């Protein structure tokens, strides 16, 4: 497996990945997703040869805050260290940044994954998070 920057947006490949994990809010707005990729700070992909296994996308200013927007791995390739490798690459790249944040599904699986990678819930540091969602 190789982690490298994802520089050439392949819409069918990306939509297939997002659909495979049930993230239809993104696939329902493919133009917004395309623009999101284009404007991301860093997009990484995990490949085995030319086969896409997973992807990560970060946004932010790269100095005071980085937000891990997406980490997705095709279901048949999950639990093989791919998500960990993508996230570890982000953490290494932005080790100088004070705040690296993310939002995730509220499931035991995802919570355990991010805790294993050194993340804590906002409530542990006296904070909470808010979100306003729309797709226009």
Task: Identify what each model region corresponds to.
Residues 84, 100, 106-126:
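Conserved active-site alpha-helix within GNAT-family acetyltransferase domains
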Residues 6, 74, 105:
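Residue-level recognition of the GNAT/N-acetyltransferase active site
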Residues 1-28, 125:
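Short amphipathic alpha-helix that is part of the acyltransferase structural core
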Residues 2, 98-100:
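Short active-site oxyanion
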Residues 69, 76-78, 93, 111-113:
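Acidic/histidine-enriched, beta-strand-rich ligand/metal-binding domains
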Residues 22-43:
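Active-site rim helix/loop that mediates acceptor-substrate recognition in acyltransferases
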Residues 73, 79-91:
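Conserved acetyl-CoA-binding loop-helix of GNAT-fold acetyltransferases
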Residues 45, 51-60, 64-72:
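Conserved beta-strand in the GNAT
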């Amino acid at each position: 497996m190789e982690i490298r920057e994802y520089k050439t947006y392949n819409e069918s490949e990306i939509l297939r990945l997002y659909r495979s994990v049930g993230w239809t809010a993104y696939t329902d707005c493919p133009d917004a997703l395309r623009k999101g990729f284009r404007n991301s700070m860093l997009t990484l992909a995990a490949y085995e040869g030319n086969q896409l296994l997973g992807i990560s996308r970060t946004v932010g200013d790269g100095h005071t805050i980085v937000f891990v927007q997406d980490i997705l791995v095709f279901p048949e390739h999950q639990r093989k260290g791919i998500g960990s490798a993508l996230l570890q690459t982000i953490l290494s790249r932005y080790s100088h940044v004070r705040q690296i944040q993310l939002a995730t599904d509220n499931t035991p699986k995802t919570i355990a994954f991010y805790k294993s990678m050194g993340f804590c819930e906002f409530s542990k540091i006296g904070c909470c998070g808010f979100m306003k969602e729309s797709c226009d």
